[in-house]
């Protein structure tokens, strides 16, 4: 007897850039500042582009990220350049993208379904949600979802909500426990070397 199985396929061409995430080798201290030994072994990503793609104008300011991992966590850091550093959302799970924000999308099985979305602003306000399917396929986020064990920090080189200040950038550090991502992993474990 044969059984037909439907496997989700992305509705748009899908060829994201590749980043090799190295294993962390040094002790970590969460403070939002990425100018420290922990991040020295992590290369920067390419500069971020508009979410709509490379056909859009280049961003006015540079944003780049770094990532590392160990047996328990995925570590993400980013530097967001800018001469005005704005943030107003202060309530968890508010619509953070109304402010300048940093966003992370994690899809443990790489099928573009059952993935986690994370956003944070310069005030260290977090919005984390789960999506069973992408927005483009009619999905909507589960706003009440909270990523257990998530830790975040922000460092500001300048002043928040003061355009007259000498603002340079803000940086973020995000610690995502692998255990928080197990629900939709085929194997409920942290990645092994070569998988991440």
Where do the language-model regions lie?
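Structural preference for beta-rich elements and adjacent junctions enriched in aromatics
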Residues: 1-196
């Amino acid at each position: 007897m044969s059984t037909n199985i439907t496997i989700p396929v992305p509705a748009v061409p899908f060829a994201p850039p590749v980043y090799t995430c190295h294993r962390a080798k040094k002790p970590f201290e969460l403070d939002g500042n990425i100018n420290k030994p922990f991040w020295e072994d992590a290369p920067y990503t390419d500069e971020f582009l508009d979410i709509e793609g490379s056909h859009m104008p280049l961003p006015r300011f540079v944003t780049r990220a770094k990532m590392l991992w160990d047996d328990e966590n995925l570590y993400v850091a980013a530097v967001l350049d800018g001469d005005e550093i704005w943030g107003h959302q202060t309530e968890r799970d508010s619509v953070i993208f109304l402010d300048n924000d940093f966003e992370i999308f994690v899809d443990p099985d790489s099928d573009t379904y059952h993935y986690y979305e994370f956003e944070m602003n310069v005030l260290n306000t977090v919005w984390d949600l789960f999506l069973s399917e992408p927005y483009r396929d009619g999905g909507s986020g589960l706003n009440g979802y909270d990523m257990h064990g998530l830790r975040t920090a922000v460092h500001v080189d300048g002043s928040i909500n003061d355009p007259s200040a000498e603002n340079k950038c803000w940086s973020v550090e995000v610690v995502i426990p692998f255990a928080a991502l197990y629900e939709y992993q085929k194997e409920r474990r942290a990645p092994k070397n070569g998988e991440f």
